[in-house]
Every structure is written in C-alpha cells, then in structure tokens.
Amino acid sequence: MNYQVLLYYKYTTIDDPEQFAQDHLAFCKAHHLKGRILVSTEGINGTLSGTKEETEQYMAHMHADERFKDMVFKIDEAEGHAFKKMHVRPRKEIVALDLEEDVDPRHTTGQYLSPVEFRKALEDDDTVIIDARNDYEFDLGHFRGAIRPNITRFRDLPDWIKENKALFADKKVVTYCTGGIRCEKFSGWLLKEGFEDVAQLHGGIATYGKDPETKGQYWDGKMYVFDDRISVDINQVEKTIIGKDWFDGKPCERYINCANPECNKQILVSEENEAKYLGACSYDCAKHERNRYVQANNISGNEWQQRLTNFDDLHQHA
C-alpha cells in the first residue's frame, strides 16, 4: 500500500488562524494531499491522506515549525486517498465543546495513561471508563465495560455527565476517544467539575490498537473514523462484531447515511437491507422525493412503491 492516512492534533498558539488556514491549504494542495484540518488560536486538529512520500513531506514540514516540532502523528497505511477533497478551516475551537468557561489542556487535563496502564484500568472494577465519543461511534465498537453516553455531539457530553454524576461519584474516572484530542479538553473539564481522580488514554484508541503489548485487547467491534474508510480494526487478539443491523438486528459493521438528504442519519445496515429499504432509516425517509438511493439506482416509480411495502412487513414482525 503506497498511501498513508495521518491523524494528529496539537494544542498550541496560532495567532492568525485565518491566514494560517489559507497558507496551509495552499501547501496541502501543492502536495496533492486530501483531508480535513481545523485551526484556531488554540491549535490544530487534522486528518489527511496522501502517498507515503507526500505525507512524509507533510510531517517533516510540520515538525520544522517550532509550534509543532513534537506533534505526534498516528499513521495508517491505505490503498488510496481516504478523502475526496482538501479542507483547512479556521474555527473557534479545534474540537467543539462550547463551554461557558473554556478549558486549556496545556494547563488543565487528566493524567495520561499509556496503553498498558489503560489496559490495567480496564481490568480494575473500581475504575469507571467513559467513552467520550458519540453514540454512533460507540455502537460500532468500544472498550469492554465502557459507559456509553447517550449523545450525538461532543458538546452535549458535559450535560450528560452532570445528569449522571451519581454513576461516577468517588470513583477513578478514565476516558478515551479516537485519537486523544477530545479527552484532552474533556478530562480537564472533569477536573474543574470537582472529579479528583481523572485520567485519559494518551493517543486514543488509535494508539492503543497499534501498541505491541496491548494489541487492542478488550476492544470489541471496529473503530469509527471520519473519512471514506468509515471504520478500522483495533483488536489484534480477537475479532468480535458488536454492531447490529438497523432493521433485523443481525451482526453488522457497515455504516451508511440515510438516503433522505434532510435526515442523513447514520445507520448500520447490510447491502441487502439497504436495497430492500431504499437506503433509508424509515418509511418517511424512504418515500422522500429526493431519496438519493432511488436516484443513484434509477429505480422506477412502480419499483419504488413496491419496495415501500417492505416497511409494512417490518412493522408486522416488530
């Protein structure tokens, strides 16, 4: 495989995010890179793909900048680009938590745990493990025994914690996320909220899965990623599927977006059920006039109506 996918972040001061974003986009395009990068006064958060040569040049370019000289890149091999376009966007935050009083992870953050230390935490009954990701990420794969916050956006996590604080009272709290960036700020917020013993998986799930000692142990399912790959394997010790098909509940690790462009809900569904239910999550979405699955597959009006009756069968067996 001649391509690489990079995942990285760095909390550091960027004085002019707008100008930085403009210059950075030009550099990335000149090196034929594709991906999504967010920049703000608090730092950079990115994931991109390119050939090995181009991604190596990118990493060297970043490490030559004093602000990013020690930035860690998580690297996956790939057969081609994992993105269709290149975006570099200035933002208020590089990860949106939208706190009234912001947290600076450079000054306030939870204790870093290595993969081996995190594995010990997973084995400790007195430690609470919180998944800091969204519900659809958790449903595809997560660490065994981790708590699933019922959220669809990271910014909703603090409110969920406040509502469920009794679950974590007087216990050691350890949190994890994909690459570590969300936990940097979230664990700092937990400390400010009065939680005394707070730690985080340093480098996130991506680092844990590549560690030669842990080899992804205790991870069930796949890890959701925000690129064209959709998911990647983590556990090198044992393979389990925990995702369930939206319609029939059978084991499934295939995510699609609902074919209704006004819905776009992510659901786990087999190719067979995607066709059967017109790529939609519900009857209302399946009959939507702009159904993308219907358009992409040139389904006739009669066939469309016929497949809509599959939802009647679904409700009868529910």
UniProtKB/Swiss-Prot annotation:
Catalyzes oxygen-dependent 5-hydroxyuridine (ho5U) modification at position 34 in tRNAs. Signal peptide: none annotated. Belongs to the TrhO family. The active site is at C177. This is tRNA uridine(34) hydroxylase. The keyword Disulfide bond does not apply. The gene is trhO. It comes from Staphylococcus aureus (strain MRSA252). One of its GO terms (molecular function) is oxidoreductase activity, acting on paired donors, with incorporation or reduction of molecular oxygen.
